[in-house]
């Protein structure tokens, strides 16, 4: 029987402008096309996990505004269970302003809004309603406060569940969320966390720190999995439209694979394939 993926993470609305090129500091670039998408790393990862076949529960928060209602409805429409998402009075839903160029590269600015209010009590309430089991996977990210991340990590450890931490945006690993977590940074985040600039060296350093495997994404080259040895997972060559959300597709698919009982390398390979597919479509969720 497959386990459940519990995502503790962010929910945003993405406001996207597609441009011929990205602006330099202080520069205005006109002629772009506008679109609005569901976003937030946690929400994107939850959607990816659900599309990969997992049962997905979500712990997070939105504001008491139309954007929040739309964001929650979009998650529910993807099959994500939204009962543990708090609607906070007097708070705005998180928003990301995204510029994407003709090569699919992006610049992103985020107003966290309700995401900054996600706390351990929300995690505890969700787990009181339905505790974790050994086959479950908890997927955590740094777009919500440390206390929520630590609560999710500790609950996973207590239940014997797998915990994945996508340390984005990169910051120091909090006490209580270091040992035993599967880290999934990109190359820049791995370098920031480890002090090592070369991805394989950074992955090994992080694995020594956590005592657990590390999966470092390296863009078009795929990913490096350190689990004892170092395994290179190549990404297929694809035509890139938009790289926004590629890491989220990887993390959600990875969590779904592990919840389904796949071994780590097989789940990681499927996750890289999903990330490669995601960059061929516009928007963080394709």
Language model features by range: what are they?
Residues 87-88, 98-137:
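Conserved phosphate-binding/catalytic loop of the ribokinase/pfkB sugar-kinase fold
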Residues 50, 157, 259:
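Gly/Ala-rich phosphate-binding loop of Rossmann-like dinucleotide-binding domains
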Residues 123, 135-204, 212, 221-222:
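Conserved beta-alpha-beta core of the PfkB/ribokinase-like small-molecule kinase fold
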Residues 47, 95-99, 107-108, 222-226:
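Short beta-strand scaffold segments in enzyme catalytic cores
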Residues 1-5, 172-176, 199-286:
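Conserved phosphate-binding/catalytic region of the ribokinase-like
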Residues 1-61, 66-77, 240:
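Glycine-rich phosphate/adenosyl-contacting loop at the front of the ribokinase-like
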Residues 74-90:
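A glycine-rich helix N-cap at a beta->alpha junction
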């Amino acid at each position: 029987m497959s386990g459940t993926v519990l995502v503790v993470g962010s929910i945003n609305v993405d406001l996207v402008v597609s441009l011929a090129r990205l602006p330099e500091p202080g520069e205005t670039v006109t002629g772009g096309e506008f679109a609005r998408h569901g976003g937030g790393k946690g929400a994107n990862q939850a959607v990816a996990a659900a599309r990969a076949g997992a049962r997905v529960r979500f712990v997070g928060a939105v504001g008491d505004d139309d954007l929040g209602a739309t964001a929650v409805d979009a998650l529910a429409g993807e099959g994500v269970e939204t009962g543990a998402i708090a609607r906070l009075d007097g708070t705005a839903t998180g928003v990301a302003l995204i510029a994407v160029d003709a090569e699919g590269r992006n610049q992103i600015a985020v107003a966290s809004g309700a995401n900054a209010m996600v706390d351990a009590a929300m995690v505890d309430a969700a787990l009181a309603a339905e505790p974790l089991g050994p086959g479950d996977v908890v997927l955590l990210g740094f777009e919500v406060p440390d206390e929520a991340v630590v609560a999710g990590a500790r609950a996973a450890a207590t239940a014997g569940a797998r915990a994945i931490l996508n340390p984005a945006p990169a910051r120091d690993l909090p006490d209580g969320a270091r040992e035993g977590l599967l880290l999934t940074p990109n190359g820049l985040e791995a370098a920031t966390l480890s002090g090592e600039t070369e991805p394989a060296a950074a992955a090994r350093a992080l694995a020594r720190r956590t005592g657990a495997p590390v999966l470092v994404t390296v863009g078009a080259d795929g990913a490096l999995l350190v689990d004892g040895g170092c395994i290179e997972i190549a990404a297929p060559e694809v035509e890139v439209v938009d790289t926004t959300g590629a890491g989220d597709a990887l993390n959600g698919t990875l969590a779904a694979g592990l919840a389904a009982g796949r071994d780590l390398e097989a789940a990681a390979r499927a996750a890289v394939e999903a990330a490669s597919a995601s960059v061929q479509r516009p928007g963080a969720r394709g």
